[in-house]
């Protein structure tokens, strides 16, 4: 079974979003399909930070990237996501 590593930049919906709670929610929502490797908080402007999340996904599951992105964008704390990179392991 092949695996892929993907990095997303996740922009919170508001500057008041608690990033620690958002990290936990992401881990919970994706626990059945992804292995979270790390989170990095990246300052953007005016006190707003984005989350960079690196995760490992199974390559042989059809539509896994779409399913992952759908789960992320359905969270009310997430305003927008951006794919930073996808690589095979």
Locate predicted features.
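Long, contiguous binding/interaction regions
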Residues: 1-89
């Amino acid at each position: 079974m092949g695996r892929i590593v993907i990095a997303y930049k996740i922009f919170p919906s508001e500057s008041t979003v608690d990033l620690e709670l958002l990290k936990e929610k992401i881990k919970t929502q994706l626990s059945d399909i992804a292995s979270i490797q790390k989170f990095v908080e990246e300052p953007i402007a005016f006190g707003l930070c984005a989350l960079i999340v690196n995760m490992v996904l199974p390559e042989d599951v059809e539509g896994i990237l779409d399913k992952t992105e759908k789960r992320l964008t359905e969270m009310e704390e997430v305003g927008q996501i951006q794919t930073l990179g996808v690589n095979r392991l």
